[in-house]
Amino acid sequence: MSQSKADYINVIGAGLAGSEAAYQIAKRGIPVKLYEMRGVKATPQHKTTNFAELVCSNSFRGDSLTNAVGLLKEEMRRLDSIIMRNGEAHRVPAGGAMAVDREGYAEAVTAEIESHPLIEVIRKEITEIPDDAITVIASGPLTSDALAEKIHELNGGDGFYFYDAAAPIVDKATIDMNKVYLKSRYDKGEAAYLNCPMTKEEFMAFYEALTTAEEAPLNSFEKEKYFEGCMPIEVMAKRGIKTMLYGPMKPVGLEYPEDYMGPRDGDFKTPYAVVQLRQDNAAGSLYNIVGFQTHLKWGEQKRVFQMIPGLENAEFVRYGVMHRNSYMDSPNLLKQTFQSKSNPNLFFAGQMTGVEGYVESAASGLVAGINAARLFKGEDEVIFPHTTAIGSLPYYVTHAESKHFQPMNVNFGIIKELEGPRIRDKKERYEKIAERSLKDLQTFIDA
């Protein structure tokens, strides 16, 4: 254990991870200096200067406890996550998922942090790793070049990266509502998605246009590599026709409504393919194209995506874009507390550690923030149980094989298996894992 003589903790970056870390530290009575460069220096992807801004989708994904990210969210609620609390307060309809009004949510997080008496917000670019105090670096996948270079030096000079993409957003008022229908897959939750059905002929024409459309050039000579969870739709399409039909355009559970009068293949009750649109803001005036992250040129996006039934005259308020994300060699560099192995006063959090996704990033900030606060107070570190979702993430990123390490979403495969004979029914198995997880977390909290 080591600790600084400074009477505060630095947090660099006010994204989901940094905001969560700063809050967790401050709620434990410790002053925080929170640095955020947006406001003095922009990033290629962020649209505002708000904290915890969502730059890709507005979805925090599944909300059921039989979904690993749903379990992680429930664990975070029980640990008083500022991200979860404000996300809940700004939910928008999304069926069985948790989606938020991205602007209202980010504004609320920003207001709560800026008004906290123990958090000093400093709008400034950090170009060196501070050595004046315990520090949590949560500068995100869009870390500025100068700081990224210093982190890469810690990384042994290796530039670990992948490319990430965002989906387009359309104005609902410009959608032809006669060609789409409201429904959630398998009718789970409220009917929260606008569905754009395609016949086989429409799909094949769309597929041809998508796979031959011109992509925007990358800003780097480096080889393209993508994280599977945010892969551009055109890259996915080039893997084969069926890839999209089993992915974002999967029609299963999205049967035509009885009053549907549009084109269909014969008397089929289910479309050949479906493009889903999800509400993006509380007012319900904006919808994003689910799973359609893209790096096509903007003119090509307009041409190709207006082939989707209902979007023939759609106005795109934001086109899809792609950016480079960096992440660390966490198995070699970090402890399960998200603490540097070489410098105990240094913590990392967020996507740069190899956790992937909004919720996962915030969870890493929660763990790093708690442990930075404990180090400040001279207390022992805490390692969350491997039987919990919030414990399985740091376990995974610090125990994976370094050579093949890639970013990871939370999933039941990284949570410690149940003892005893394997339960064959997947839903029942996940229910048992979730039950054990929440019980173990409560025991851990009470200890």
From Swiss-Prot:
<keyword id="KW-0819">tRNA processing</keyword>
<keyword id="KW-0521">NADP</keyword>
<comment type="similarity">
    <text>Belongs to the MnmG family. TrmFO subfamily.</text>
</comment>
<dbReference type="InterPro" id="IPR036188">
    <property type="entry name" value="FAD/NAD-bd_sf"/>
</dbReference>
<dbReference type="GO" id="GO:0050660">
    <property type="term" value="F:flavin adenine dinucleotide binding"/>
</dbReference>
<dbReference type="Pfam" id="PF01134">
    <property type="entry name" value="GIDA"/>
</dbReference>
<dbReference type="GO" id="GO:0030488">
    <property type="term" value="P:tRNA methylation"/>
</dbReference>
<keyword id="KW-0489">Methyltransferase</keyword>
<dbReference type="InterPro" id="IPR040131">
    <property type="entry name" value="MnmG_N"/>
</dbReference>
<dbReference type="GO" id="GO:0002098">
    <property type="term" value="P:tRNA wobble uridine modification"/>
</dbReference>
<protein>
    <recommendedName>
        <fullName>Methylenetetrahydrofolate--tRNA-(uracil-5-)-methyltransferase TrmFO</fullName>
        <ecNumber>2.1.1.74</ecNumber>
    </recommendedName>
</protein>
<keyword id="KW-0274">FAD</keyword>
<dbReference type="GO" id="GO:0047151">
    <property type="term" value="F:tRNA (uracil(54)-C5)-methyltransferase activity, 5,10-methylenetetrahydrofolate-dependent"/>
</dbReference>
<keyword id="KW-0963">Cytoplasm</keyword>
<feature type="binding site">
    <location>
        <begin position="13"/>
        <end position="18"/>
    </location>
    <ligand>
        <name>FAD</name>
    </ligand>
</feature>
<keyword id="KW-0808">Transferase</keyword>
<dbReference type="InterPro" id="IPR002218">
    <property type="entry name" value="MnmG-rel"/>
</dbReference>
<dbReference type="InterPro" id="IPR004417">
    <property type="entry name" value="TrmFO"/>
</dbReference>
<comment type="function">
    <text>Catalyzes the folate-dependent formation of 5-methyl-uridine at position 54 (M-5-U54) in all tRNAs.</text>
</comment>
<keyword id="KW-0285">Flavoprotein</keyword>
<dbReference type="GO" id="GO:0005829">
    <property type="term" value="C:cytosol"/>
</dbReference>
<dbReference type="InterPro" id="IPR020595">
    <property type="entry name" value="MnmG-rel_CS"/>
</dbReference>
<keyword id="KW-0520">NAD</keyword>
